[in-house]
Amino acid sequence: MVRTSFQKVLETITRKALPCFLTSTILLMVLPVFAADKQKDEDTLRQANLVLQGLLNSKSISPTLLAKANCVLILPGVKKFGFGVGGSGGRGPLLCRSGQDFKGKWSAPAMYSVGGASVGLQVGGSSSDFVLLLMNSKVVNQVLNGKTKMGTDATAAAGPGATAASASDADIFTYGRAKGVFAGVSLGGATVEPDNDANYRLYSKTLTATDIVRGTDTKPSEEGKALVTVLNSKIGKQSK
């Protein structure tokens, strides 16, 4: 069962049977932090929407490849770690098509985190945007069920350009934006995993990534709805 940091704090308070005044003090300290972090989650969704629209409006990716994607992971503003610390880190929403064969409308967003040295090598300046296309049900199930290392648990490749005659059979295609232009980049060695704390904040209950993107009654926030609307209007359903 998924247990978030916020739930662990509440469990600690309950288990230790702390005095009321101390419990109140702890909650007064924790709740504002929880609210601030939730606002950051909403900001991430809003920024992801802008990144997605930037990719969709660019001529850097084949519409056919987009139409074949089972899921999309959008990572806005991935930041490079400071001097002496290898790699980079960031987070963003994963959205998947509905239906057993991943050909339906797009799901509510589940928040994910990403990290690894290979990401840091691709980050231009202080931060960069990335979009990952998950191309088959095998890699989708891998990503939904826990931490996935690209290149080890799933094959990953730089996304082909819009004029490419064909694409490889990689599980994941990756695009990065540098200086306003999207291009295929390699993120082999990077890891992605569900951000359970962020998902708890966004949905106000404990949900796994699978619950969110494969569920039928998950209700996203307004920022999440806006992201779903863009995907459904720009890409829509896959052809059978």
Predicted regions and their residues:
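Hydrophobic alpha-helical segments, especially transmembrane helices
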Residues: 16-17, 77
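Small-residue-enriched, tightly packed secondary-structure blocks
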Residues: 36-240
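Low-complexity, Gly/Pro
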Residues: 12, 32-35
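Bacterial N-terminal signal peptides
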Residues: 17-30
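N-terminal secretory signal peptides that target proteins for export/translocation
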Residues: 1-15
